[in-house]
Regions:
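Phosphate-binding active sites in nucleotide-utilizing proteins
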Residues: 136-141, 145
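Hydrophobic, small-residue-rich membrane helices and short re-entrant helix-turn-helix hairpins
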Residues: 108-120
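Individual alpha-helical transmembrane segments in multi-pass integral membrane proteins
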Residues: 1-101, 122-134, 149-166
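Secondary-structure edge/capping motif, primarily at the C-terminal ends of alpha-helices
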Residues: 10-14, 105-111, 141-142
Length: 167
């Protein structure tokens, strides 16, 4: 993802801009999938079955994903002021790893003692990717642009964390 985003940010070809939109769409769907998986793990625990906080986490995950998809759609269609739209996209990109880390923390906190050692590699792997994404997108929000060097190693960081996710 990082190399494709770097190539699309350095070139101004319109069909590559469409690839950039597809990459951002894939990133949104990846986060939505991890949200669904982590919420499924949380729902399996007794402490979250009849809890209003769990419903709040679901609403937050759905709204963040929808916000990102709407902003992406507006960007692709060319609607809205670019400055406001790009800020919205960057804030959404920064908020998504934050929510993912909150969900991951809740999964780890509510794990039983028997399953704690089984869930630690998952938590380390996902936390590594989310911390790097938070670094990348918080810097982008501060400076209103993505750092090309950090973006180019994003794929390497995500690939380095994958062995922790595999059984």
């Amino acid at each position: 993802w990082g190399w494709l985003l770097l190539i699309t940010s350095l070139t101004h070809v319109t069909h590559i801009t469409q690839w950039l939109a597809l990459v951002r769409l894939a990133d949104q769907l990846r986060y939505a999938s991890w949200y669904a998986f982590l919420l499924f793990l949380l729902h399996a625990h007794r402490s979250f079955k009849d809890n209003r906080n769990f419903v709040g986490l679901i609403v937050l995950a759905v709204s963040l994903t929808a916000w990102g998809l709407v902003a992406l759609g507006l960007d692709v269609l060319g609607m809205g002021a670019w400055d406001q739209l790009s800020r919205g996209i960057l804030f959404n990109a920064m908020a998504m790893p934050i929510l993912a880390m909150v969900l991951l923390e809740q999964v780890f906190r509510n794990a039983t003692k028997d399953s704690l050692w089984n869930i630690k590699p998952l938590c380390f792997g996902l936390a590594g990717t989310y911390v790097f994404d938070l670094y990348l997108f918080s810097q982008a929000v501060l400076f209103n642009r993505l750092d090309e060097e950090a973006l180019s190693v994003r794929g390497i960081v995500h690939a380095a964390m994958m062995p922790l996710l595999l059984p």
